[in-house]
Amino acid sequence: MEQDASELKVSKIRRGTVVDHITAGMAPAVLRILGIHAGFSSVAVVAMNVKSDKLGYKDIVKLEQVMLTEDMLQMIATIAPQATMNVIDDFQIVEKYEVSLPEVLRSILKCPNRHCISNSSEGVASHFALEHTAPIAEYRCHYCEELVQADRAELIL
């Protein structure tokens, strides 16, 4: 079998998670959500602006020995609603699913209204409700009713 010289192969991971179909350019934000930093001790592979039939261009993050929590999935969904998760075990995909935008977000997004009670020293957690999903997902603050685009919102990490 002949391999296309322009194709780059990245080795498989034994156990972990592959986050695929990330909005192009958003891989660094996904890494922040997942707490991946320079001192991360497992294998982390990031591919950015990869050609995609589905999205035109996409980012991919492969993480060995990392399984995602529900909070992580919700945060990823807010910045990359078309992302897919592949759970890997013994080098095989054992589960594959798409993220979905949560109806309610608590303590995930920061309200852009600096006067909102969720930004005060009162210790009130942010609380947003999904307003609509197309063309861009937008969430409305429960307290001040500020509308925020999910892909431009500041995440609370």
Spans of features found by a protein language model:
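Interaction interfaces in information-processing and related assembly proteins
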Residues: 2-97
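Cys/His-clustered metal-coordination modules, chiefly Zn-binding fingers
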Residues: 91-157
